[in-house]
Swiss-Prot record:
NCBIfam families linked: PRK00010.1
UniProt similarity note: Belongs to the universal ribosomal protein uL5 family.
Protein name, per record: Large ribosomal subunit protein uL5
Gene this chain is encoded by: rplE
Protein's job: This is one of the proteins that bind and probably mediate the attachment of the 5S RNA into the large ribosomal subunit, where it forms part of the central protuberance. In the 70S ribosome it contacts protein S13 of the 30S subunit (bridge B1b), connecting the 2 subunits; this bridge is implicated in subunit movement. Contacts the P site tRNA; the 5S rRNA and some of its associated proteins might help stabilize positioning of ribosome-bound tRNAs.
Amino acid sequence: MSDTLKKYYYKKIVPKLIDQFKYKNIHQVPKLVKVTINRGLGEASQNAKALDSSIKEIATITGQKPVVTRAKKAIAGFKIRQGMPVGVMVTLRSQRMYEFIERLINLALPRIRDFRGINPKSFDGRGNYSLGVKEQLIFPEIEYDKIDQIRGMDISIITTAKTDEEGRALLKEMGMPFRSN
């Protein structure tokens, strides 16, 4: 399934970007490096059941078991001790990354309520894009009956692009539905 996006990238997107930005070498063309998906547990960090359900959901969505992130320092105001689980994250590369991006663009994003496109200003200045998802139900792999609570996640798409303009062009060619301002 994901081979299609990768093949499309090399056959169609690379020549377009070389034309658009006048690259002299094919290795200058921006490409996807990795996708990281992160979910902070918030007040659910005291609840072991919430941690387990988050691990299962992220694993179902990505096809890869997430890593549990732990608190570096104790914070009394949040009732967090050092070493307590505070979130889960997963890093996708190569095959799984392309599969996830394809599912995100074609299946998940169109299922968001009142969706008009994603914010084109969420680039970090170096061609990487981050977006927040408010609920996990937009992914077709998640069954409505099996979730205990609606939780969101952060998705970061890391590219080799040097500027936001290059990163935006790459993602737009891949089919990312940016909102027109």
